[in-house]
Every structure is written in C-alpha cells, then in structure tokens.
C-alpha cells in the first residue's frame, strides 16, 4: 500500500482554442458567491443599490490587474519584460493572489473615496467575509496547478506533484505536504466564523472588528 498520493491533475479544464483553467474557474466561482454575499449584506443594511455595482467594478478590476501584475513582477519578470504584450493574455493563466489582494485594497480605497464617502473599514468589514471564501477557492486552484506545496513528509497524505517541475527539482521521489489543502481548510473555517459573526453577533455594528 502506497503511503503517498500521486497528484497528476491537469490544470486546464477546457482547451477549445481558449483555455479554461481550474485556477481561473475557482477565482470566478469565488467572486460570484462573494458578490451574492455582499449583496445580501447591503440589502440587510439598506445601503444604496448602486453601491454594489460600483464596488464590484472596483474590486474586479483591482483583483484582475493586481493578480496579473503580481504574477508578472514576482514570478516571471524575465519572460514578460521581453514579451510585454503577453501580459494582456490573462486567459492563459498567471495570476498571483497576493497581487490580487493589493488590487482589492486599492479598489476599496477608491470606492470609499469616490462613492460611499465612508471609512474604508466599513467596506473592508463586509468584504473580508467573501474574501476568506475566495482565498480557499484560490488554494484549490493552486492544488490543481500543482504549486505552492510544502516540505517533504512521510505522512500517508503526502502528495507527489508529478506535473510540477519545481517539485521534481526540489523533492524528486519524495512526497510533500499538500499545504494548499491545509490553507483552503483554514480559509473555509475562517469564512464560516466570519459569516457567523456578521449574521449572529451583529458584527456589522462594530466598524473595524
């Protein structure tokens, strides 16, 4: 009996001329669910309906631009500096969640400054709930990409990421911790806690909580 899991998932879900990658799909699903969560919060608090659309534009634009530029500058600058037009091909993959986080922060600041005229904390208090969910979805995308794994392990749930060149270079023949799964579970648990705090503990009445 093997004491490890061989992970050979294809990061591309559909390839019909234009690729649909698992990472991008997880990002999109998280966004759609997050939109509905924030919409319910806004209705619950009587916030102007148009705010939701404006916030969506700012956060989507900030996330996509930030995630793309984060990947470009942090991971593949040598390639994209020589092929700058390739930066525009977001549909081919190459997004970094930390870059997306920076983009969201900037988007919220713009929304607060030009639309809501409220403290950015008011908006962040509502966005952190779906962001925790999106974080978990993104880590599932990382799992499908065979990236962001942990150190070597002999535990029975260790993964061998056979599609990963980095794994082959760093841990050839060794199982590693599936840290994507660990993080995803933590994000989903945080999401559940934040949902409970908002809807059951009236956390919306305590800005910055």
Features from the language model and the residues they span:
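A feature for loop-to-transmembrane-helix boundaries and adjacent hydrophobic helices
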Residues: 1-209
């Amino acid at each position: 009996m093997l004491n490890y899991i061989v992970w050979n998932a294809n990061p591309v879900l559909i390839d019909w001329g234009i690729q649909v990658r698992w990472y991008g799909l997880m990002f999109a699903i998280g966004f759609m669910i997050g939109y509905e969560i924030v919409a319910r919060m806004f209705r619950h608090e009587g916030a102007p309906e148009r705010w939701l659309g404006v916030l969506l534009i700012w956060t989507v634009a900030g996330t996509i631009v930030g995630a793309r530029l984060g990947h470009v500058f942090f991971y593949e600058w040598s390639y994209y500096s020589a092929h700058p037009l390739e930066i525009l091909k977001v549909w081919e993959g190459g997004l970094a969640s930390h870059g997306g986080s920076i983009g969201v922060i900037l988007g919220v600041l713009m929304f607060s400054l030009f639309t809501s005229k409220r403290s950015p904390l008011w908006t962040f208090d509502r966005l952190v709930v779906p962001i925790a969910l999106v974080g978990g979805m993104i880590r599932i995308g990382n799992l499908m990409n065979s990236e962001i794994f942990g150190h070597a392990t002999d535990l029975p749930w260790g993964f061998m990421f056979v599609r990963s060149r980095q794994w082959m270079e760093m841990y050839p023949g060794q199982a590693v911790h599936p840290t994507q799964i660990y993080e995803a579970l933590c994000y989903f648990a945080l999401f559940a806690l934040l949902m409970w705090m908002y809807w059951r503990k009236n956390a919306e009445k305590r800005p910055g909580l």
